[in-house]
Amino acid sequence: MEWWRRWYFLWGGDSVGAAILFYTRLPWPPSWPVNFDRIARWITLMGLLLSLILLALDRGLHWLGMDNLLQSAVVVSLWLALTGGLHLDGVADTADGLAVTNPSKRLAVMQDSYTGAYGVMAIAVVLLLKTFALASFSDHGLASWALIMALGWGRWGQLLAIALYPYLRENGKGAMHKRNLKLRPDLLLGTMIIVFGGVGMGYALAIEPWLILGATGSSALIAWAVGRWFAQQFKGHTGDTYGAVVEWSEVLILLGLSLV
């Protein structure tokens, strides 16, 4: 078993396992060691993993002949369940913070355990837009690929936000991401995962090369712009705004691809 342990740690299995436990509700063998120190480098891999699960469900429901809108609602429901609402909680808290006109009080409002009216509305908007965007695709192969692009590049936006902007709280779940990130190697790894994963799945699903190239560039631009916009509103980022970057990037990427 010694060879297995060497291989496991050499290829970052302990870090991947920790990323699965932190970012998803998927199981991981409790006897396998995990290390949470640098899990942010695997966040785009988590996006690809989740998108493949959703893609399988989407394809299965399509094969069964389920109505498009109902099918999309089921897929989005599993999407929410697989993440445990981790990022959606950030959408709510960030919306409540943005509703405060005094910027100096926004962080305090976001720490309140109660969700305000703006937070509830933001959650509803995100879920509705995802559902209707998925239902609007006339090409089912493109809809499947859109899931991969949205989940992967949305999380790349979070990785970029961690790398580029200051973290506004000394403690919290997001602090360890900023503290432990090794900028160049981790950002490069996360970018390579989603670029090769997105392009590879695009070819596998028979997506036109011009669309693969254009959507890859556009998705990266959207994810960067969303992270930058939230950083401008708060003068940096928190764990909540990281979640908001993921969710709103996913929404905008889905909406953009639905127009093709």
Swiss-Prot record:
Subcellular locations according to the entry: Cell inner membrane
Reactions catalysed: alpha-ribazole + adenosylcob(III)inamide-GDP = adenosylcob(III)alamin + GMP + H(+); alpha-ribazole 5'-phosphate + adenosylcob(III)inamide-GDP = adenosylcob(III)alamin 5'-phosphate + GMP + H(+)
GO biological process: cobalamin biosynthetic process
Entry's transmembrane regions: 7-27, 45-65, 117-137, 145-165, 187-207, 210-230
Cofactors: Mg(2+)
Biological source species: Synechocystis sp. (strain ATCC 27184 / PCC 6803 / Kazusa)
Family membership: Belongs to the CobS family.
Function: Joins adenosylcobinamide-GDP and alpha-ribazole to generate adenosylcobalamin (Ado-cobalamin). Also synthesizes adenosylcobalamin 5'-phosphate from adenosylcobinamide-GDP and alpha-ribazole 5'-phosphate.
Keyword Disulfide bond: no
Topology within the bilayer: Multi-pass membrane protein
Domain of life (superkingdom): Bacteria
Protein name: Adenosylcobinamide-GDP ribazoletransferase
EC number: 2.7.8.26
